[in-house]
């Protein structure tokens, strides 16, 4: 009879399960549970196949019991640590809750009921005063205790909310009217300013144009050849301070020459002639090609300022100052 084949008990390195395998020449074997290929390292038993299988069952049972014991020990250790950590916390919480009740009534033991009632009565008005002061504090910034006096006027300063809209408008209109009257009083002759006053003051005060700020500009030698305010398209505007200064300087130097009436035109009265309507001319007698002022003009043609003669008879416009520009000659710089 052939001898029975020998078997050996092996243990997988990955799943740690005991199993029986037949003895082979090669040292390589494969796990029956997880299929892991591995080499022979240690044999836990050798014998017949039946004996090796019974031995494998015993080893696996022992391994299962050991793993269960280890898991139980681990769980017990974790539960014990949690209980140990929770024990002092619960003890502290209980110690905090326990003395909280006697703290409220600890000092009340030594006090009489009458004293307690008196203390409660005293505390109520104090609370009322605190509430009243807290209610008054938000409104205190809006109502200061002391009024601030204005150092310039000597009157208490008012806030913008205290002033009415009507008072602000009246002040604004008063400033506009005073500025307008001040600039009108600084104007030229009363004969020319009366017509302008009547036209400008015909508008309501709140629609009047704001007074133009006068700039002290240096006088220029070409300012005398500029248009007069009467010849400009805006007849109601007053002459600029620059033109007034140049005209007054010409009057002071005595370089003014009276303009003779041209043939075919009406003559103006010298009494109502404004000072800004007078201009200076330089004598240039050596040039024969210059157009003289005595040349006759057509009666039906309009004037140089763009208005017909019929309107000129109704109202005398101021004298023209730009006649030098019609000569067609260059100006001399030594004026």
Curated annotation (Swiss-Prot):
Q: Where on this chain is Nuclear localization signal (NLS) (motif)?
A: 145-148
The UniProt entry's GO CC annotations, sorted and at most eight, read:
Mre11 complex; nucleoplasm; nucleus
- What segments bear the compositional bias annotation Basic and acidic residues? 286-297
Query: After translation, how is this protein modified?
Result: Phosphorylated; phosphorylation is constitutive and occurs in the absence of any DNA-damaging stimulus. Phosphorylation is necessary for its nuclear retention.
Q: Ranges of Polar residues compositional bias? A: 129-142, 177-194
Write out the entry's keywords from A to Z. Answer: DNA damage, DNA repair, Nucleus, Phosphoprotein
Query: Where is this protein localized, as stated in its record?
Result: Nucleus; Nucleus, Nucleoplasm
Extract the ranges annotated as region (Necessary for the association with the MRN complex).
203-230
Main subcellular location: nucleus
Specify whether Membrane is a keyword of the entry. no
GO BP terms: DNA damage response; DNA repair; mitotic G2 DNA damage checkpoint signaling; positive regulation of double-strand break repair via homologous recombination; positive regulation of protein kinase activity; protein localization to chromatin; regulation of double-strand break repair via nonhomologous end joining; response to ionizing radiation
Instruction: State a single Gene Ontology molecular function.
Output: chromatin binding
Spell out the family assignment given in the record's similarity comment: Belongs to the MRNIP family.
Reported function: Plays a role in the cellular response to DNA damage and the maintenance of genome stability through its association with the MRN damage-sensing complex. Promotes chromatin loading and activity of the MRN complex to facilitate subsequent ATM-mediated DNA damage response signaling and DNA repair.
| PANTHER family attached to this UniProt entry | MRN COMPLEX-INTERACTING PROTEIN
What is this protein called in UniProt?
Answer: MRN complex-interacting protein
State the organism of origin: Mus musculus
């Amino acid at each position: 009879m052939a001898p029975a084949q020998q078997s050996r008990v092996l243990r997988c390195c990955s799943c740690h399960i005991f199993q029986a395998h037949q003895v082979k020449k090669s040292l390589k074997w494969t796990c029956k549970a997880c299929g892991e290929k591995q080499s022979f390292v240690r044999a836990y038993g050798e014998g017949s196949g039946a004996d090796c299988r019974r031995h494998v069952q015993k080893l696996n049972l022992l391994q299962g019991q050991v793993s269960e014991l280890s898991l139980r020990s681990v769980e017990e250790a974790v539960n014990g640590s949690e209980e140990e950590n929770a024990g002092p916390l619960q003890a502290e919480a209980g110690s905090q809750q326990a003395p909280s009740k006697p703290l409220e009534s600890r000092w009340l033991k030594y006090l009489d009921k009458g004293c307690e009632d008196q203390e409660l009565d005293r505390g109520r008005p104090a609370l009322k005063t605190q509430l009243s002061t807290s209610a008054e504090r938000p409104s205190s910034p809006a109502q200061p205790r002391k009024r601030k006096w204005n150092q310039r006027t000597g009157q208490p300063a008012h806030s913008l909310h205290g002033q009415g809209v009507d008072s602000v408008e009246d002040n604004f209109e008063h400033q506009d009217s005073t500025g307008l009257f001040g600039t009108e009083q600084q104007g030229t002759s009363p004969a020319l300013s009366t017509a302008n006053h009547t036209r400008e003051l015909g508008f309501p005060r709140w629609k009047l144009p704001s007074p133009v700020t006068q700039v002290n500009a240096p006088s220029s030698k070409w300012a005398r050849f500029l248009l007069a305010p009467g010849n400009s398209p805006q007849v109601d505007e007053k002459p600029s301070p620059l033109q007034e200064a140049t005209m007054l300087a010409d009057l002071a130097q005595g370089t003014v020459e009276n303009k003779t009436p041209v043939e075919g035109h009406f003559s103006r009265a010298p009494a109502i002639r404004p000072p800004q309507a007078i201009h200076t001319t330089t004598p240039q007698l050596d040039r024969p090609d210059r157009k003289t002022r005595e040349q006759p003009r057509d009666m039906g043609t309009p004037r140089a300022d763009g208005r017909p003669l019929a309107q000129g008879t109704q109202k005398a416009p101021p004298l023209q100052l730009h006649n030098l520009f019609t000569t067609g000659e260059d100006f001399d710089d030594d004026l």
